[in-house]
Amino acid sequence: MSLSENQVSQIAHLACLSLNEAQLKDNTQNLNTITSLFEQLANIEIDGVEPMLHPLHMFQRLREDVVSEKEQLALFQSIAPKVRNGYYLVPTVIK
């Protein structure tokens, strides 16, 4: 599927974009390149290929869950404009 400059111009209008002639030609070429890549993907033969959840057939070794930062609540609350009972107070946005 190939897009014409007229179609790209309509897409740009719907996206509230203003394109000059050079930008229109460039974007038309770029979008046609992208759609041709999707066409290539659609034509790949995948019969007999099992879906996989992860490309690697091994489990990821995870590090031990250890606290790596020191407690800084008092420091952060000391520079906050308003704090009450350990909570930051902010202006009401929705009533």
Swiss-Prot record:
Q: Which GO terms describe its molecular function?
A: asparaginyl-tRNA synthase (glutamine-hydrolyzing) activity; ATP binding; glutaminyl-tRNA synthase (glutamine-hydrolyzing) activity
| Disulfide bond residue pairs | none
Question: Which is a Pfam family this sequence falls into?
Answer: GatC
UniProt keyword annotations, A-Z: ATP-binding, Ligase, Nucleotide-binding, Protein biosynthesis
Q: Which GO terms describe its biological process?
A: glutaminyl-tRNAGln biosynthesis via transamidation; regulation of translational fidelity; translation
Its job: Allows the formation of correctly charged Asn-tRNA(Asn) or Gln-tRNA(Gln) through the transamidation of misacylated Asp-tRNA(Asn) or Glu-tRNA(Gln) in organisms which lack either or both of asparaginyl-tRNA or glutaminyl-tRNA synthetases. The reaction takes place in the presence of glutamine and ATP through an activated phospho-Asp-tRNA(Asn) or phospho-Glu-tRNA(Gln).
Q: What is this protein called?
A: Aspartyl/glutamyl-tRNA(Asn/Gln) amidotransferase subunit C
Classification from the root reads:
Bacteria, Pseudomonadati, Pseudomonadota, Gammaproteobacteria, Candidatus Pseudothioglobaceae
